[in-house]
A protein has these predicted regions:
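Conserved DEDDh/DEDDy metal-dependent 3′-5′ exonuclease domain
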Residues: 1-131, 169
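Conserved "right-hand" nucleotidyltransferase catalytic core of DNA-directed polymerases
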Residues: 1-14, 71, 98-299
Length: 300
């Protein structure tokens, strides 16, 4: 959609070679300012056709987040309703099939055109709101440049060695097995499942007679904090072994998740979330690279 009131909706399958080149040049032109909702995702989609998008002056997703960071949902229809008081009909309301789209369903295309118009209207509204909140400079000088930096980071990925990850997985599995054996030896019973909170309660509070921890729905707490307090109080080797087992298993699980996330290019392509936390920091998902425990030497 253009500020002049023109809209165009098309599928790339309808473009002839000349049109495709022209569209690619228009998308890449930094002098032509563009507003999008979720520019990072759009850039990923366009990159699949070797297109680059330049001149993005407003990402309404990011702008809405800066104004109301505590919201749980920033999809386009919710953002339009939140900031403009307009309820848009979903483009796929009525569960349109690919056949409907292929048959040029007018309602579907009109809905997409309407949404394109509202991207521009929303961008204008959010520009005023950013000014009112004193966040215009933050938006243009930090958040908007960061959008495409994150897109490139996600696209390029993080190079890893699958062999090294498999070696780590094996090492942590062996550490966990060793800790499990030490736990069994310390109480003279190799039938106890130290991964079972219920069986841990029986060993700690009934068999070893330790003071009971905080009451829970399933008995008494056996979380890490509770076990560490018991270890400080009693110093029993069973507790040390259980804590060591848990630490090793957590690292093994983390490494297994990383192995599963490695792509054919031997890189991990995580998603960096710019609009999730209320504090403004980045988060990472699929996989969560911020969930790697680094407080211990093994974690590091």
């Amino acid at each position: 959609a253009s500020p002049a009131g023109q809209q165009m909706v098309c599928t790339t399958t309808e473009l002839n070679p000349d049109d495709e080149v022209a569209l690619g040049e228009w998308l890449a032109d930094e002098a032509i300012h563009k507003a999008l909702h979720d520019a990072k995702m759009a850039a990923h989609c366009l990159a699949g056709r070797d297109w680059h998008i330049g001149g993005v002056c407003c990402d309404t997703l990011v702008a809405s987040y800066l104004i109301l960071p505590g919201q749980r949902n920033f999809n386009f229809t919710d953002v339009v309703e939140r900031h403009m008081g307009v309820t848009l009909e979903s483009a796929d309301k009525g569960q349109l099939t690919l056949v409907d789209v292929a048959e040029n369903n007018d309602r579907y295309w009109e809905s997409l055109a309407e949404r394109a118009v509202y991207v521009l209207l929303l961008a204008t509204q959010l520009a005023h709101d950013l000014e009112d909140y004193g966040e215009t400079r933050l938006f243009h000088e930090m958040e908007m440049p960061l959008v495409m930096v994150l897109q490139r980071m996600e696209h390029d990925g993080i190079a890893v060695s699958p062999r090294a990850l498999h070696d780590l997985e094996k090492d942590f599995a062996e550490q966990a097995a060793l800790m499990e054996r030490e736990a069994h030896e310390s109480i003279g019973d190799d039938t106890v499942n130290i991964g079972s909170p219920k069986q841990l309660q029986t060993v700690l509070f009934d068999q070893l007679g330790m003071s009971k921890t905080k009451k829970t729905k399933t008995g008494h707490s056996t979380n890490a904090e509770s076990l560490e307090k018991l270890y400080v109080k009693y110093g029993h080797p069973f507790l040390a072994a259980v804590l060591g087992y848990r630490a090793a298993m957590k690292l093994k699980t983390t490494v297994t998740g990383l192995i599963n996330a490695v792509g054919d290019d031997e890189r991990i392509h995580t998603t960096f979330n710019q609009t999730i936390t209320t504090t403004g920091r980045l988060s990472s998902t699929d996989p969560n690279l911020q969930n790697i425990p680094v407080r211990t030497d093994d974690g590091k």
